[in-house]
Amino acid sequence: CDPTFILDCAPCNVICSIIFQNRFDYTDQDFLTLLEKFHENLNILSSPWIQVCNNFPALIDYSPGIHNKLLKNIAYLKSYVLKKVKEHQESLDINNPRDFIDCFLIKMEQEKHNQQSEYTIENLIATVSDMFSAGTETTSTTMRYGLLLLLKHPEVTAKVQEEIDRVIGRHRSACMQDRSHMPYTDAVVHEIQRYIDLVPTNLPHAVTCDIKFRNYLIPKGTTILTSLTSVLYDCKAFPNPEVFDPGHFLDESGNFKKSDYFMPFSTGKRICVGEGLARMELFLFLTTILQKFNLKSVVDPKDIDTTPVANGFASVPPFYQICFIPL
């Protein structure tokens, strides 16, 4: 099967459970429409045209179709979130918050006399929209790319499954406490993120004040694009960086080895706020899949191409077929 749909649904429902309290059925039309909008936006943002427009914004006026589609999808998401917020306002119990929206609304009520408060309906909608946009496609794309790499490298998959059998077994679910006892699996998750280099140029940021850096004056308001590729593929930190090798995160004794050059979530004050959740999802999704299934490719592993089909905002893996064989 093509794993795209199921790998889209799982992380999106995790976000839904945090924001809305409830999970969606995978046939729910609202849920499917949300997934469609997220998928379209990732493909648009990863297209060469968008990268050209980033450098020459005036071109948007001459060919606005894709740009308008992106904005229309964002507007749909915000209108959907607003509808959910209004439903929460009608049923809010300040003594019994159910989810993120409730907690935000309670904080709004507590600060309603503070004119400088950041807790506003507009910021709530923006925050929830950001959580969806940043927390759904990124995790699902990483998982989709990760399974492709495991198909390409069955020897790596076998080692992960051996560690799962030894630490977790077959009769209980994986939990985050297991990760510290599974250095090889932890290394594989890290190497997947390093190797795929999901967001090569990071998210654009703006300088908040004039700053001098290495004899360059960077004026306030300047847009900054940082190259995460330069650290994730640094040959001093990761020998043979073009090779998928979990050993990049293992020491000579087979223990997990941290690296200061591992920053797929960026770094500093503006690091991805969803890093903790994404790390948990990737570990738990991967171990659960490999605990329950063997992976089989429909082609010879040597013939699997892992080159991204789009490499603009995000590195998007090629579509592929995979067989999940129950253990």
Swiss-Prot record:
Heme binds at residue 272. PROSITE patterns: CYTOCHROME_P450. This is Cytochrome P450 2C42. GO terms for biological process: organic acid metabolic process; xenobiotic metabolic process. Induction: P450 can be induced to high levels in liver and other tissues by various foreign compounds, including drugs, pesticides, and carcinogens. Its EC number is 1.14.14.1. The gene is CYP2C42. Signal peptide: none annotated. It comes from Sus scrofa. Belongs to the cytochrome P450 family. Cytochromes P450 are a group of heme-thiolate monooxygenases. In liver microsomes, this enzyme is involved in an NADPH-dependent electron transport pathway. It oxidizes a variety of structurally unrelated compounds, including steroids, fatty acids, and xenobiotics.
